[in-house]
């Protein structure tokens, strides 16, 4: 597998998981969801890792996962929303392949997050403040796709076309 990775990131509610799955299916690549991988390796859900070990511990595990995956080739990687906020993680992933940051209008995010019943540790706080804190990190990623008024299928097709043009 000589192909570069395709890394899909963004704030919670932007569609990372759904879009990543579709991109992997369309390209016949293996999908790696970083949060799911961390859960598998640690043996507990992310929410429990946050509750029992704290965010600092989680970010350390996440950093290790980032470096491990960046050394692999040919994956579609769906990151946790905070993984590429870390400058080092972002640089490592940018060097490993094509990184796409999914965005959405705050009003659209609010609607999606209200409809999402999953247990997101950082949802318990002020998600708008968290989005604002992460904004500059997300904006530093060169490829941005606004998911506000597009279907997951449209977004996946856009990413596939982008990667085929770039020969990723």
Over which residues does each language-model region extend?
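Post-Walker A helix-loop "phosphate-sensing" segment adjacent to the P-loop in P-loop NTPases
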Residues: 25-36
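ATP-binding Walker
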Residues: 14
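ATP-dependent small-molecule kinase phosphotransfer cores
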Residues: 34-83, 87-94, 137
